[in-house]
Amino acid sequence: MAEGEDVPPLPTSSGDGWEKDLEEALEAGGCDLETLRNIIQGRPLPADLRAKVWKIALNVAGKGDSLASWDGILDLPEQNTIHKDCLQFIDQLSVPEEKAAELLLDIESVITFYCKSRNIKYSTSLSWIHLLKPLVHLQLPRSDLYNCFYAIMNKYIPRDCSQKGRPFHLFRLLIQYHEPELCSYLDTKKITPDSYALNWLGSLFACYCSTEVTQAIWDGYLQQADPFFIYFLMLIILVNAKEVILTQESDSKEEVIKFLENTPSSLNIEDIEDLFSLAQYYCSKTPASFRKDNHHLFGSTLLGIKDDDADLSQALCLAISVSEILQANQLQGEGVRFFVVDCRPAEQYNAGHLSTAFHLDSDLMLQNPSEFAQSVKSLLEAQKQSIESGSIAGGEHLCFMGSGREEEDMYMNMVLAHFLQKNKEYVSIASGGFMALQQHLADINVDGPENGYGHWIASTSGSRSSINSVDGESPNGSSDRGMKSLVNKMTVALKTKSVNVREKVISFIENTSTPVDRMSFNLPWPDRSCTERHVSSSDRVGKPYRGVKPVFSIGDEEEYDTDEIDSSSMSDDDRKEVVNIQTWINKPDVKHHFPCKEVKESGHMFPSHLLVTATHMYCLREIVSRKGLAYIQSRQALNSVVKITSKKKHPELITFKYGNSSASGIEILAIERYLIPNAGDATKAIKQQIMKVLDALES
């Protein structure tokens, strides 16, 4: 069930008894938001109580004066712009002359101090003046005005709320999920959400709506205490304009943008109840992953978006976590339920699949279009029947599952695009594919007695393919140590708690047609006519060097490894360190420099540089917006490299595994992948430098 579904719709009762209860609760003091919510129940607030309620909702009631320690000097480089914007705002308010000067100073001080304390450069496009408008009408003292403004900026204005910003790519995915036809139309006209909704989000509608309407919207929004709810309010406003937009196809791009941008201005007080009710409905029909996977858009900058987070502008559709897929279909009654479509090749599906998944071989789309069309027809019929019968496999929401490997999932992406082109609503993709599902089941110890997921995996036999212990040992035996693996021809090895057992898994897996490395779309499509390479333990050509620890080896990459560990073993300070690329390349201790692309587990790539010194290897990731500069993305000691591997199909894709060794075996601590031109020369040079380090340690 999507988060926020429990919040009741706006009631229609107009009795004033609740207003008296509210006033008494506020007068008594110590009132929290939950208490207020129970009294107000979403109704528009009385004007004389609004300030107190908002301060409690924003958690600033009783907070001290943040500006007390400030010298009050208005001396920012952009101060003239701030003053001009504030003056223009005061003129619009029709404030008595004797109060205008004081209010002007308050507003200018709030903006100036916020810029100074947060180290932000002010510009008119930021919508801050509009954001202050509803607060100014509350006639708050300067300290409260600042505290409320700060709280709204921190909790309700998303990070990167700018042209081409991440919040707007996310909004497009939400539009596509619920209104694919409208999304397709806007895409065709190259109208992106930031072109019309920048100030919707940046001012929480205050830029376009009257003060009265804005305050009514904020009354409900602040009581929800859910920053993501603004997305659903925006969606309803957009959906409300859908019919007009689609019937005026002759309008130019600029005309459509102007029309959309001003749509909120037509809202009146009577519309607010329906606006919230409809937004709540769409919210309840949205997967929880929409919020959970993007929670870092809001809140403290300490939880900011990492550079390696998925680029939402490149996302084909909304991604759903495998944990949500499993949990959703165990729910009873209303809520988001998924009809899972497994798009892997037949041999992989037969080896093991989610027991409730419908199989749709994505290869058929190119190899046998007529059979593919029939399969799609069967899929939709099966979905309909499963919903009608109340089956656990039933769900309105189509979720496509691939292998989790970008090279193979390209074909699934074509299938996804097919459904999106048909304007099919509620289309999503399982994040990480079947590989992520297996990993999740291993992580939660799927055979444990206290969970209900044990029946989720099926195989060709039709019976449950349990996650059995390796080497045929009893699940309860002492040698098992709780480490499980799918061994009935499963296509990837699961993460285990012991390297020794992990090594055993390798020799048990015969079919390795589900490699784990997910590549970006820039790489050439795999040749589907070629025979898949089967891997056995004999393929492990790398051997320890003279027993030196840690063990280091070079060889072809095992295409079933799933013990992925994020390579970010650095501190936050390291991650933020910015350096000049050329200065570092020219350092006397840098022995080798290799331009490359860092490849994250998600498949996304970042232009980078590998620098090798006598003892360390550094990865400098280029900062796109600051030419010539880079982040120190990784700093690894050469003696911690335990394995370097490459792919048969993509020899330029090099994987470095870092760790240490003990009597029980090798412990992998970090994994990094790079796409390196002339990879052979690079790995040779790095290997030679590693050998020098190991020789020095040995001697």
From Swiss-Prot:
May mediate the interaction with FKBP15 and WASHC2: annotated span: 574-699
Q: Enumerate the residue ranges of region (May mediate the interaction with WASHC1).
A: 514-699
The UniProt entry lists the main location of this chain as Golgi
Q: Which residues form the Rab-GAP TBC domain?
A: 44-225
Matching entries from CDD domains are given as: TBC1D23_C-like
**GO annotations of cellular component type:** cytoplasmic vesicle; cytosol; Golgi apparatus; trans-Golgi network
Q: Where is this region: May mediate the interaction with C17orf75, FAM91A1 and WDR11?
A: 514-573
Q: Is Phosphoprotein given among the entry's keywords? A: yes
Question: Which SMART domains is this protein grouped with?
Answer: TBC
UniProt-annotated stretches for the region Disordered: 459-483
Matching SUPFAM superfamilies, A to Z?
Rhodanese/Cell cycle control phosphatase, Ypt/Rab-GAP domain of gyp1p
Compartments where located: Golgi apparatus, trans-Golgi network; Cytoplasmic vesicle
The residue ranges flagged as biased composition, category Polar residues, are: 459-479
Q: Which disorder does the record name?
A: Pontocerebellar hypoplasia 11: A non-degenerative form of pontocerebellar hypoplasia, a disorder characterized by structural defects of the pons and cerebellum, evident upon brain imaging. PCH11 features include severely delayed psychomotor development with intellectual disability and poor speech, microcephaly, dysmorphic features, and pontocerebellar hypoplasia. PCH11 inheritance is autosomal recessive.
Q: How does this protein assemble?
A: Directly interacts with GOLGA1 and GOLGA4. Interacts with FAM91A1, C17ORF75 and WDR11; the interaction recruits TBC1D23 to AP-1-derived vesicles. Directly interacts with WASHC1 and WASHC2A/FAM21A. Interacts with FKBP15.
Q: What does this protein do?
A: Putative Rab GTPase-activating protein which plays a role in vesicular trafficking. Involved in endosome-to-Golgi trafficking. Acts as a bridging protein by binding simultaneously to golgins, including GOLGA1 and GOLGA4, located at the trans-Golgi, and to the WASH complex, located on endosome-derived vesicles. Together with WDR11 complex facilitates the golgin-mediated capture of vesicles generated using AP-1. Plays a role in brain development, including in cortical neuron positioning.
Please report the name of this protein according to its UniProt entry.
TBC1 domain family member 23
Natural source organism: Homo sapiens (Human)
* Gene (UniProt): TBC1D23
